[in-house]
């Protein structure tokens, strides 16, 4: 049972990255970035497809050389998800991939070069109807801003962003989004808050170089969660030193927790204690693995005893309240006469979830045998 989020989103303009709308109330897009060698076309295509299968809306690909630009052309021809080309230092690479059907160009103000070079990139983007992302990063600010501020600060990131926003404005180009990422949560959040007050272009959120799977997920959840709860953000990436597929899962989990966008199962599970009537931890691990393919938004509560089990089940699509030998089953908040054998919880609960979704989609329900 999913209710609407109370969050009032910041108003922003609309751009399109391929067929994905960004800003102006569009669903917050979740994206990741490949970590393969772009020159290895087969490996990169395979990873893009895996990221897409995980639910990504957009994938970014690093294009560091002209040879990589040629590889990008082949990659683009083999995938269907919108691709963003990540461009640093050599603006001519952006001009090349623009001809190859890229869906968005990411440029870094800290290293892309002079206004003349930016003008060339804008001209190519305009010619091919491609949006641009101005990607400011606390680790690669322009040298003069480093000297002015001494160290990265929200004001420094804002000045870098606005410097290039104003260039695009002078060039009468408004098809762009902006990010002001940093590895420090407060630095990034402060910069995004300042930027959100200055412009109405879509904002791409991220805590850059957040860390490994655990620490990076926590840091991203805190930082992105603060901004999203304030209505700031139109697209996001969770940056992890991990499999990019995990970035998509964590990204959707963050949106799901704020009731902004739901995909797949929202599990509600107790941490377990001596009152548990079945092994909650093992049950959850198995259910998460077996139901990973589900994309339909469904809330499932798995509580090991009757203290909180019935209450959580009342607000879940499917709920399990632990009891001796056979646990209570709830569907749409209503307790069922049938009960679930504690020795076979995973198989039976999986069946109920799939049956629930089949009925919701008007498909043939699965026949589940339940111990009465």
Swiss-Prot record:
InterPro entries per the UniProt record, alphabetical: Dihydropteroate_synth-like_sf, IspG_bac, IspG_bac-typ, NO2/SO3_Rdtase_4Fe4S_sf
Binding note for cofactor: Binds 1 [4Fe-4S] cluster.
Cofactor(s) for this UniProt protein: [4Fe-4S] cluster
Gene Ontology process terms (BP): isopentenyl diphosphate biosynthetic process, methylerythritol 4-phosphate pathway; terpenoid biosynthetic process
Single GO MF annotation: iron ion binding
Stated role: Converts 2C-methyl-D-erythritol 2,4-cyclodiphosphate (ME-2,4cPP) into 1-hydroxy-2-methyl-2-(E)-butenyl 4-diphosphate.
Protein family membership: Belongs to the IspG family.
Gene3D superfamilies per UniProt: Dihydropteroate synthase-like (3.20.20.20), Sulfite Reductase Hemoprotein, domain 1 (3.30.413.10)
Name of a matching Pfam family: GcpE
Enzyme Commission code: 1.17.7.3
UniProt-recorded name of the protein: 4-hydroxy-3-methylbut-2-en-1-yl diphosphate synthase (flavodoxin)
Residues that bind [4Fe-4S] cluster: 270, 273, 305, 312
Annotated catalysed reactions: (2E)-4-hydroxy-3-methylbut-2-enyl diphosphate + oxidized [flavodoxin] + H2O + 2 H(+) = 2-C-methyl-D-erythritol 2,4-cyclic diphosphate + reduced [flavodoxin]
Pathway recorded for this protein: Isoprenoid biosynthesis; isopentenyl diphosphate biosynthesis via DXP pathway; isopentenyl diphosphate from 1-deoxy-D-xylulose 5-phosphate: step 5/6
UniProt keyword annotations, A-Z: 4Fe-4S, Iron, Iron-sulfur, Isoprene biosynthesis, Metal-binding, Oxidoreductase
